[in-house]
C-alpha cells in the first residue's frame, strides 16, 4: 500500500522551469482553470457538516472532503481511484486537490479590477486617456460615457451627465451610443487598436514641446507597448468571470459549541455571489434601470472589497468592526504570504534553550543537554537501534527511547559524534549569527557556549536563549563543517579583523599577567629557560610581575617555510615568560613582551592568523582564553569603594570654575555680553573644568609611587583594580571612571540642550535630590533611544539586503581599466585612515610607479596583501588607483578582481560569493551601536567651529591645492580662490596633513617653503568675509550714494567711520536698480584689468558689506576692499548616527543644498527679481549661457566676473549626491558617499571596509536615463538597467548601428529595490500591489536571477554552494539553444580514425 502511494507520488513530476511570468488572465483562461461554477453562497450544512452543492465548498467542484471517498459514501477505498460518483458527482481522489482546484463565478455584469483602476497611475485611465475621477463616475453609475458618436457632434469618451444624456437623446435620437458602468469601459477598451495608437504616438512624440504633455504621452506609450508586446488585451482589465480560491486555502473550521471559525474571504465571496444572483434575477425580470444600476454598483463594490478591501471607500467590516482581510491583504505586509511564509519558513529538527558559559570547551564545541540531543537526533537513534538489532521495529525503538534505556545513551553518543549542529541567536544581524559546532553531551538543561564566540553572536549570559538546528543530509553536514564551523569564522566579514578576540575577564587576566611591578619578589633573577621560570613561579621564588632576564628559544619561519631556531636573552617579567609557553612556534616573543591590553591581543591573533594560518590561531585562541581565566582568578581584581580615588585638586578646580561663572554673570548683567554668549561661555568653563578634574583623577589613579631596590622613590603604573579594568580594555572607560571618582559633568535636557549647571558631585560622594533628578533625564532618553534604534536599524538592514541581494561574484576578471583613486584620509591635520588600511586586499587598476621614476612598483591586477602594503609604505606611495565594484564591467554581477580579497577568508574572493548580502549585513549589523539623535551645535561644540588659523603638527614643506593667490605689500600670499586646500608634504613627497583654507587667508610662508611642527602658517578672520583686491591703484566708488544705497556708521569706541551697503530690500525705489561697486583706476584714470584677463577690475558690493576706505584712496595688491560680516552660522542641527546613514543611502536631497555650477565659465548677475537674484554663467567657448535664480539670503561664494569650473560650489550648504553625480561624475559621488558613511561609523569606533559601502553604491547606480535612443528600442527619458543598455549597445556597435547614450542615475536604496528587474523580489519588499499591477500589465517574466526570488520559489540560491548548480543548469540551457553542428567525416578521415583506434588497441595488448 505504502509503496503504491509512493509510486503515485512520483507520477506527478515537478516541472523544470526557468522563470515565472505574470500577466492578465482572459475570461477563457479563468474558465479553463475552473472545475465548475459556484452558484450559491452557502458554505456547509451546519447540521451534517457536509459541503452544500454548488456552494463555496462544493465537493463536486473542488474535490472530496475525505481521502478516496465520495460525498455520499458510495465509493470508498483506493481501488475506485478516479471514478466519478453518479449519485453525488464527486471524483474519488485525494483531499489535497481541495487546495489546488479552483472554481469560478460568472458575473452578470462586467466589473473593473480595482488594482488596474485605483493603483496609481490608473492603468485603465492611462489607456483611455481619461482621468480617474471620470472613469469612477462611469463605473459607479453617476454619468454616461459616449462609446460610439456616430454622425453627431459628440466625441468618443465624452462624459455626459444624466441631463445632458437625455438632451442628446432628444436631439440625436439613436444616432449615437452612450452607456454607463463597467460595460461602457469594457467597450471603450475593446475598441482600442494598440498597433495604430502606438504608431501614432511615436510619430507625435518628437514634435511635442510641453514637458508635461511629453511625459504623459511617453507614459501612455510605454503602457500601450507593454500591452502590445506582452499579448495582454486591455479589456482583460475588466472582469467578466471571477476565479474562486480553492476552499482549503480559505478554510471554515467548526469550533466546539457549534460556532465556526472562518476565513474572511468566505464572507467576501458570499457577498459577491449574493449580489450576483440578485442581479441575474433582476435582469431576468427586466427590472427598472435604476434598480439594476444600483445592484450593478453594489456588485462592483463587493468585487472591489474581495480583491482589495479598503482601497476604495470604507473597508467592509465583519461582525467585530474589524476590516475583512481581502486577497490583496493576504499577500502584502509582514504577515503576508511573501514575508511570512515564502521568505520566513519554520524548520523542524530544532530546539531552543537558555545559554550558559562553557569555559572548558574547545572553540569548535558546544555543550548540548542530553534531553535535547535525544529529541533532536531521534530518527538517527531509531535507525541505529534497528540496525544494531537492539530493537525489532520502529515502535520498539520508540519505547526504548522513551524509557531511556542505557543502550540508548551509547547509541546517542555514536550518533552525535562528528555530527555538527548549528547554533543561532536572534536577532541574526550578520552571517556570524549562525555557526556550527560539534555537540558535547552535558547534564542539565542549558546549552553551553564557548566564551570567544559570544562577540560574534552578541550574546551574554543574563538569560539569553539560543536555537539549535540539526543539518540532516550529508551535504548539509558537509557545509556546516566546511563553511559554518566556528573555527572557520575567525575573521569578521565586515573588516577582516579577528572576531574571536578575548574580552572582559580574559583580557583582564592576560593584562594582569603581563604587567610589571618595580621591586617585585624575585626581581633581577636570571633564568636559563622558560621552564625554569615556571618552577620559580610555582615555588614562590619569583612573583608574577617580577622583572627578570630569561633566555628564550624562538622559531623563525622563512619565506620558503623552513624553520630555524634562535636563542636570545630578553628582559621581561615572569608572567610574560609564562605567556610565551602558549605562543605558537613561529611568532616572535616581542608580541607578548608588552602590556597585553585588548588591542594588543587582537593584533597578536591577527598576526598569528596571517603568519601561521587557521589551525594554529584556533588552538592559540583557546589557550589564551584558558590562561586568561586562570590568571584573572589569581589576580583577585575586585571593585571596592576605596578604589575610586577622588583627586584632592577637584574641590579647588570646581571652586575656580564657579568663580569664573559668577564673573560672566556679572558681565551679562552689566550688558557686556549677550545671553547667548553668556550661556556658551558658562558651558565652556564647565566643560574645561570637567576635563581638568578628570585629568587630575586619571593621573592620580594611573600611577603610584613605590620604592625600588636602591631605596629610591619611583613612579609606576598603578595596580588599582578599576584602573586596570579600564586600561586593559576589559570593562569601563575613562569617562565612566570620571563619573565615579571625578565629577558627573554637564547633563542634557530631554530636547538635547545642555543644562548650564553641571553635576559637580560624583557617584562615590553621592548625588543630592536635584542632581539625581537631572540625571534621570539622560537615563530615560537612553532607554527610549535604544528601543527606537533597534527598529530603525533593522529596517535599514532590510532595505540594504533588498537592494543588494542579487549581487554575486560571477567571473574572475571583467578586464576594466577603471578604478577609484585611494588616498590616505586626512581630517584637519590627522591621518584618520592611512593608505594601507584603505587599499589592503584590493586589486591595483593602474600600474603604481616608484616615486619620481618610470619603473613599475606594483603592476596592474596585483592583489595588495600585507607584504605589498609594506612595500607601498616603504616607498611612501600616497595614491593608488584600485579596482572597485562601482566601476566593474560585469553584467548582472561583479568580477573577483574588482572586489578583491574576501575579508573573512584572507584570499581573493571565490565565485558565487554573495557579496551583496555580506555588504548589507556588514553595514546594518553595527547599526544598533550608532546614535539616533541629531546634534545641536551649541555650547561645548561651538568652540571648534570658529577656527581662524592653521597650526601644523608635522614638519615638511607647504603645498597648495587649486589655490589662486596674490602677494600683498608685506610679501605674504593672500588666497583669492574658494575651495583651496593647503597640505604639508614630507621630504619623500607624502602628504602628512591637509587643511581647507577660506578666501582671504593670509599665508605666513610661501609655497614650497619649509615649515616646522607647531608653526602657525595661515590666518584668517572667521567672522567676516573679505573682498580682496588683485591689483594696485586708486579706488573709485560707483553707485554709492549716501542714504540711497549706503549709510555711514561711526564706531563709538574708536570714533572711526565706515560705510555700510544697504540690502536691496532696505533701499528706496531710486536705489533698487543701482549696483554699488568699487572700480580700480590706474594713474591716468583708466580702468585697470585683472592680471591675465580682459576683465576690468571692479568689485560689486553685496548688501551689508562694510567698507573702511574713502573714495579715491590708494590701495595695494592683496588689501581688503570691503568686509562682509558672516552671520554666526545659525545653529543647524547636524544629523548624526543612524538617520544620517539612512539619508545617504536613500540619496535624499538636503534641505538647503549647496548650489553647484552647472557649466564652466564666467559668473555675472542678471536682473534681480523679488527675493531672488539671477546668476548667469557664460562659457568661455561661446556656448549657451546658463541661468539660475538664487534666493537672496543664500551666501554666495562668487563675485561678478569670477571664473568657475563645472561642479564648483557657488553657494555653501550640504552637497546633494545627485548634483555631485551629474556635475562631477561617478567617482566623486562614490567617494562622497563612502567618506560620509564612514565618518558616522568612525565616530562610534566601528570599522567597516570601504568595499561594502561601494557594493551598495553600485546597486544605487544600477539604473540610467536614456538621453538619446539611437537605434535601440528604448524610449528617450526611459529609466533602464545599465547592463541592458551596455549589452544592447555592444550588439549595435557590432552591427555598425547607432548606440544609445545615457546618463547614470542615482537611486535611493528603497527606490532601487523597487526598480529591480525581478518583480518577485520587488513585490516581497514593499508596495506589493503596485509592483504586481505593473508587472502584470507588462506581462513581465522573472528570470530568477537574484537570491530572494529563488528562495521564494523554493530553489537553491545562485550563490555559495548553489552557484555551481545554477551555472551547470544555465550552461546546459545555453547548449540546448545552440544550433547543432554536424561534422561530416570524409572517407579517408574515417579510415584514418579506424586505423588509429586499431593501433591504440594493439599497443595495449
Curated annotation (Swiss-Prot):
Residues reported to bind Mg(2+): 460, 462, 464
Keywords: DNA-directed RNA polymerase, Magnesium, Metal-binding, Nucleotidyltransferase, Transcription, Transferase, Zinc
Keyword Membrane: no
Cofactor comment: Binds 1 Mg(2+) ion per subunit.
Substrates-to-products reaction catalysed: RNA(n) + a ribonucleoside 5'-triphosphate = RNA(n+1) + diphosphate
InterPro entries: DNA-dir_RpoC_beta_prime (IPR045867), DNA-dir_RpoC_beta_prime_bact (IPR012754), RNA_pol_asu (IPR000722), RNA_pol_N (IPR006592), RNA_pol_Rpb1_1 (IPR007080), RNA_pol_Rpb1_3 (IPR007066), RNA_pol_Rpb1_3_sf (IPR042102), RNA_pol_Rpb1_4 (IPR007083)
Residues bound to Zn(2+) 2: 814, 888, 895, 898
Disulfide bridge partners, by residue number: none
Required co-factors: Mg(2+); Zn(2+)
Chain sites annotated for binding Zn(2+) 1: 70, 72, 85, 88
BP GO annotations: DNA-templated transcription
A Gene Ontology term for the protein's cellular component: DNA-directed RNA polymerase complex
Highest taxon in the source lineage: Bacteria
Entry's EC annotation: 2.7.7.6
GO molecular function, one term: magnesium ion binding
SMART domains, per database record: RPOLA_N
CDD domains in the record: RNAP_beta'_C (cd02655), RNAP_beta'_N (cd01609)
SUPFAM superfamilies recorded: beta and beta-prime subunits of DNA dependent RNA-polymerase
Entry function: DNA-dependent RNA polymerase catalyzes the transcription of DNA into RNA using the four ribonucleoside triphosphates as substrates.
Subunit structure comment from the entry: The RNAP catalytic core consists of 2 alpha, 1 beta, 1 beta' and 1 omega subunit. When a sigma factor is associated with the core the holoenzyme is formed, which can initiate transcription.
Family classification: Belongs to the RNA polymerase beta' chain family.
Name of the protein described by the UniProt record: DNA-directed RNA polymerase subunit beta'
Species: Shewanella sp. (strain W3-18-1)
Amino acid at each position: 500500500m505504502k509503496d503504491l502511494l509512493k509510486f503515485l507520488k512520483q507520477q506527478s513530476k515537478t516541472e523544470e522551469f526557468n522563470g515565472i511570468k505574470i500577466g492578465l488572465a482572459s475570461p477563457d483562461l479563468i474558465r479553463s482553470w475552473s472545475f465548475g461554477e459556484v452558484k450559491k453562497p452557502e458554505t456547509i450544512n451546519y447540521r451534517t457538516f457536509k459541503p452544500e452543492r454548488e456552494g463555496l465548498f462544493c465537493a463536486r467542484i473542488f474535490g472530496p472532503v475525505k481521502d478516496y471517498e465520495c460525498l455520499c459514501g458510495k465509493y470508498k477505498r483506493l481501488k475506485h481511484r478516479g471514478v466519478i460518483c453518479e449519485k453525488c458527482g464527486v471524483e474519488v481522489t485525494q483531499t489535497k486537490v481541495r487546495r489546488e482546484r479552483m472554481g469560478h463565478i460568472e458575473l452578470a455584469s462586467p466589473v473593473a479590477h480595482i488594482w488596474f483602476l485605483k493603483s496609481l497611475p490608473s492603468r485603465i485611465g492611462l489607456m483611455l486617456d481619461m482621468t480617474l475621477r471620470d472613469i469612477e463616475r462611469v463605473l459607479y453609475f453617476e454619468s454616461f460615457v459616449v462609446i460610439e458618436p456616430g454622425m453627431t457632434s459628440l466625441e468618443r469618451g465624452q462624459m455626459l451627465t444624466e441631463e445632458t444624456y437625455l438632451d442628446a437623446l432628444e436631439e440625436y435620437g439613436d444616432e449615437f451610443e452612450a452607456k454607463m458602468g463597467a460595460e461602457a469601459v469594457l467597450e471603450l477598451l475593446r475598441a482600442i487598436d494598440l498597433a495604430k495608437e502606438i504608431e501614432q504616438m511615436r510619430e507625435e512624440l518628437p514634435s511635442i514641446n510641453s514637458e508635461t504633455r511629453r511625459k504623459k504621452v511617453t507614459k501612455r506609450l510605454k503602457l500601450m507597448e507593454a500591452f502590445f508586446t506582452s499579448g495582454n488585451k486591455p479589456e482583460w482589465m475588466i472582469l467578466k468571470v471571477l476565479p474562486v480560491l480553492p476552499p482549503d486555502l480559505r478554510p471554515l473550521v467548526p469550533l466546539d459549541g457549534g460556532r465556526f471559525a472562518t476565513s474572511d474571504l468566505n464572507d467576501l465571496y458570499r457577498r459577491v455571489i449574493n449580489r450576483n444572483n440578485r442581479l441575474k434575477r433582476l435582469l431576468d425580470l427586466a427590472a427598472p434601470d435604476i434598480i439594476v444600476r444600483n445592484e450593478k454598483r453594489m456588485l462592483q463594490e463587493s468585487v472591489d472589497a474581495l480583491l482589495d478591501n479598503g482601497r476604495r471607500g470604507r473597508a467592509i467590516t465583519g461582525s467585530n468592526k474589524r476590516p475583512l482581510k481581502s486577497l490583496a491583504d493576504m499577500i502584502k505586509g509582514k504577515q503576508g504570504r511573501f514575508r511570512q511564509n515564502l521568505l520566513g519558513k519554520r524548520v523542524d529538527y530544532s530546539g531552543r534553550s537558555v545559554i550558559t558559559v562553557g569555559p572548558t570547551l574547545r572553540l569548535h564545541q558546544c555543550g548540548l543537554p542530553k534531553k535535547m540531543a535525544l529529541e533532536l537526533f531521534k530518527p538517527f537513534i531509531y535507525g541505529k537501534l534497528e540496525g544494531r538489532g537492539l530493537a525489532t521495529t520502529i515502535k520498539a525503538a520508540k519505547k526504548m527511547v522513551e524509557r531511556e534505556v542505557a543502550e540508548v545513551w551509547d547509541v546517542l553518543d555514536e550518533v552525535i559524534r562528528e555530527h555538527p549542529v548549528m547554533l543561532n541567536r536572534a536577532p541574526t544581524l550578520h552571517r556570524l549569527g549562525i555557526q556550527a559546532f560539534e555537540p558535547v553531551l552535558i547534564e542539565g538543561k542549558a546549552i553551553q557556549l564557548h566564551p570567544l564566540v559570544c562577540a560574534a553572536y552578541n550574546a551574554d549570559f543574563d538569560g539569553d536563549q539560543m536555537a539549535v538546528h540539526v543539518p540532516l543530509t550529508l551535504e548539509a553536514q558537509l557545509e556546516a563543517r566546511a563553511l559554518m564551523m566556528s573555527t572557520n569564522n575567525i575573521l569578521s566579514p565586515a573588516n577582516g579583523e579577528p572576531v574571536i578576540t578575548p574580552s572582559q575577564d580574559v583580557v583582564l587576566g592576560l593584562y594582569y599577567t603581563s604587567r610589571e611591578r618595580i621591586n617585585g619578589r624575585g626581581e633581577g633573577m636570571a633564568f636559563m629557560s622558560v621552564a625554569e621560570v615556571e618552577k620559580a613561579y610555582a615555588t614562590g621564588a619569583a612573583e608574577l610581575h617580577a622583572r627578570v632576564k630569561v633566555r628564550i628559544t624562538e622559531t623563525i619561519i622563512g619565506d620558503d617555510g623552513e624553520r630555524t631556531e634562535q636563542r636570545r636573552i630578553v628582559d621581561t617579567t615572569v608572567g610574560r615568560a609564562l605567556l610565551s609557553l602558549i605562543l605558537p612556534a613561529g611568532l616572535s616573543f616581542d608580541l607578548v613582551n608588552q602590556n597585553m591590553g585588548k588591542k594588543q591581543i587582537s593584533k597578536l591573533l591577527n598576526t598569528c592568523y596571517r603568519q601561521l594560518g587557521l589551525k594554529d590561531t584556533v588552538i592559540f585562541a583557546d589557550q589564551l582564553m584558558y590562561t586568561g581565566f586562570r590568571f584573572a582568578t589569581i589576580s583577585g581584581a575586585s571593585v571596592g569603594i576605596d578604589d575610586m580615588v577622588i583627586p584632592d585638586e577637584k574641590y579647588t578646580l570646581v571652586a575656580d570654575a564657579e568663580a569664573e561663572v559668577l564673573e560672566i554673570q556679572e558681565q551679562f548683567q552689566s550688558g557686556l555680553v549677550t545671553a547667548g554668549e553668556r550661556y556658551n561661555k558658562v558651558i565652556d568653563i564647565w566643560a574645561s573644568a570637567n576635563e581638568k578634574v578628570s585629568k587630575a583623577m586619571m593621573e592620580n589613579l594611573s600611577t603610584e609611587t613605590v620604592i625600588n631596590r636602591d631605596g629610591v622613590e619611583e613612579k609606576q603604573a598603578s595596580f588599582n583594580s578599576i584602573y586596570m579594568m579600564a586600561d586593559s580594555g576589559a570593562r569601563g572607560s575613562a569617562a565612566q571612571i570620571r563619573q565615579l571618582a571625578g565629577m558627573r559633568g554637564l547633563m542634557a535636557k530631554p530636547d538635547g540642550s545642555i543644562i548650564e549647571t553641571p553635576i559637580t558631585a560624583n557617584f562615590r560622594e553621592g548625588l543630592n535630590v536635584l542632581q539625581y533628578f537631572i540625571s534621570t533625564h539622560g537615563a530615560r532618553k537612553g532607554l527610549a533611544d535604544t528601543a527606537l534604534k533597534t527598529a530603525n536599524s533593522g529596517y535599514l538592514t532590510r532595505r540594504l539586503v533588498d537592494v543588494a541581494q542579487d549581487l554575486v561574484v560571477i567571473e574572475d576578471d571583467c578586464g576594466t581599466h577603471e578604478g577609484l583613486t585611494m588616498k590616505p584620509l586626512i581630517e584637519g591635520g590627522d591621518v584618520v585612515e592611512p593608505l594601507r588600511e584603505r587599499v589592503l586586499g584590493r586589486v591595483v587598476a593602474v600600474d603604481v610607479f616608484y616615486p619620481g621614476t618610470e619603473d613599475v612598483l606594483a603592476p596592474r591586477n596585483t592583489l595588495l596583501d600585507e607584504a605589498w602594503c609594506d612595500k607601498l609604505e616603504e616607498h611612501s606611495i600616497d595614491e593608488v588607483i584600485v579596482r572597485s565594484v562601482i566601476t566593474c564591467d560585469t553584467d548582472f554581477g561583479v568580477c573577483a578582481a574588482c572586489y578583491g580579497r574576501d575579508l573573512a577568508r584572507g584570499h581573493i574572493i571565490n565565485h558565487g560569493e554573495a557579496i551583496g548580502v555580506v555588504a548589507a549585513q556588514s553595514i546594518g549589523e553595527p547599526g544598533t551601536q550608532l546614535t539616533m539623535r541629531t546634534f545641536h551645535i551649541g555650547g561645548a561644540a561651538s568652540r571648534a567651529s570658529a577656527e581662524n588659523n592653521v597650526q601644523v603638527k608635522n614638519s615638511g614643506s607647504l603645498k597648495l591645492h587649486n589655490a589662486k593667490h596674490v602677494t600683498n605689500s608685506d610679501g605674504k600670499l593672500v588666497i583669492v580662490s574658494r575651495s583651496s586646500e593647503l597640505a604639508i608634504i614630507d621630504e619623500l613627497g607624502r602628504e602628512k596633513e591637509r587643511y581647507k583654507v577660506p578666501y582671504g587667508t593670509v599665508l605666513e610662508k610661501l609655497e614650497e617653503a619649509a615649515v616646522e611642527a607647531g608653526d602657525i602658517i595661515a590666518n584668517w578672520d572667521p567672522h567676516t568675509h573679505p573682498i580682496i583686491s588683485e591689483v594696485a591703484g586708486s579706488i573709485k566708488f560707483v553707485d554709492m550714494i549716501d542714504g540711497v544705497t549706503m549709510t555711514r556708521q561711526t564706531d563709538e569706541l574708536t570714533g572711526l567711520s565706515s560705510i555700510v551697503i544697504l540690502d536691496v530690500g532696505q533701499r528706496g525705489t531710486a536705489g533698487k536698480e543701482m549696483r554699488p561697486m568699487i572700480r580700480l583706476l590706474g594713474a591716468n584714470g583708466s580702468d585697470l584689468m585683472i592680471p591675465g584677463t580682459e576683465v576690468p577690475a571692479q568689485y560689486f558690493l553685496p548688501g551689508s558689506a562694510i567698507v573702511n576706505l574713502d573714495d579715491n584712496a590708494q590701495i595695494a595688491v592683496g588689501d581688503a576692499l570691503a568686509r562682509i560680516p558672516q552671520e554666526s552660522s545659525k545653529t543647524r542641527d547636524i544629523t548624526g548616527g543612524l538617520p544620517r546613514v539612512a539619508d545617504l543611502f536613500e540619496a535624499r536631497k538636503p534641505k538647503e543644498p549647496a548650489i553647484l555650477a552647472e557649466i564652466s565659465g564666467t559668473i555675472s548677475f542678471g536682473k534681480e527679481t523679488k527675493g531672488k537674484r539671477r546668476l548667469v554663467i557664460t562659457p568661455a567657448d561661446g556656448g549657451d549661457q546658463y541661468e539660475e535664480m538664487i534666493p537672496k539670503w543664500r551666501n554666495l561664494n562668487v563675485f561678478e566676473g569670477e571664473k568657475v569650473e563645472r561642479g564648483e560650489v557657488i553657494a555653501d550648504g550640504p552637497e546633494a549626491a545627485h548634483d555631485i553625480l551629474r556635475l562631477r561624475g561617478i567617482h566623486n559621488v562614490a567617494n562622497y558617499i563612502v567618506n560620509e558613511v564612514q565618518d558616522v561609523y568612525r565616530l562610534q569606533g566601528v570599522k567597516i571596509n570601504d568595499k561594502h559601502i561601494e557594493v551598495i553604491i553600485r546597486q544605487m547606480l544600477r539604473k540610467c536615463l536614456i538621453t538619446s535612443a539611437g537605434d535601440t528600442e528604448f524610449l528617450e527619458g526611459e529609466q533602464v538597467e545599465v547592463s541592458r543598455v551596455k549589452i544592447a549597445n555592444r550588439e549595435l556597435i557590432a552591427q555598425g548601428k547607432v548606440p544609445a547614450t545615457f546618463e547614470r542615475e542615482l537611486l535611493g536604496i528603497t527606490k532601487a529595490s523597487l526598480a529591480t528587474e525581478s518583480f518577485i523580489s520587488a513585490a516581497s519588499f514593499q508596495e506589493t500591489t503596485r509592483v504586481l499591477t505593473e508587472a502584470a500589465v507588462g506581462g513581465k517574466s522573472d528570470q530568477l536571477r537574484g537570491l530572494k526570488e529563488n528562495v521564494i520559489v523554493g530553489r537553491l540560491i545562485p550563490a555559495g554552494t548553489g552557484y555551481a548548480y545554477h551555472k551547470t543548469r544555465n550552461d546546459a540551457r545555453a547548449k540546448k539553444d545552440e544550433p547543432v553542428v554536424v561534422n561530416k567525416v570524409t572517407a579517408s578521415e574515417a579510415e584514418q580514425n579506424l586505423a588509429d583506434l586499431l593501433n591504440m588497441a594493439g599497443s595495449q595488448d
